[in-house]
């Protein structure tokens, strides 16, 4: 079949680090969606057979109604950010931009800090966490309207609480790995292909008289992991492993900076 031939060709191209003159991609139909980005648009969800880290198609839906086109985009955006972190982290997303990202010593702490980062925007959002959701966390999640919760696991008591909301989509994620497929973006008349942006600098050079301490260095790395997933122009204000303000998608940096600093307020 064409998909089988494409898989073989792509395997050898990757093995030999070749850039193919012709690129054949094979996807299988996962779902026919109710509609696309707008109600008048037809839409479908196709997936590749791969072991991509935190890939949505490898997650198990435990509860809730089917995903929409926009839900899938938001969930994927949340998982892209979550895959950056090894430590316990919670990511909250609205309209494909993070509204709160935070680390913590527990899932409850990480979720609480992500919520506190922007308690307004998280309403109706998507939450992803790389740990087990317990009863205490579930009760806090249940207190607001969320579209989707994605986590690596759930306590039985947590599921009892969360499933009381009929329409809440609950997903159990596959284990994290370091597999990252190339990113493909459609453009008019073609596609763009690039390697996944999963690298941070090996070392940093302080160019100011005041040198950063270890805590500040960790915040720099935390901020870099988040900001690359924010729509440009992107500004992120962070402290102690928590976003305090996020300015996204403005046509100039000054506008994004004003939004981020205004959101962070006195904490900036």
Task: Please place each PLM-identified region on the residue numbering.
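ATP-dependent carboxylate/acyl-activation modules
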Residues: 3-268
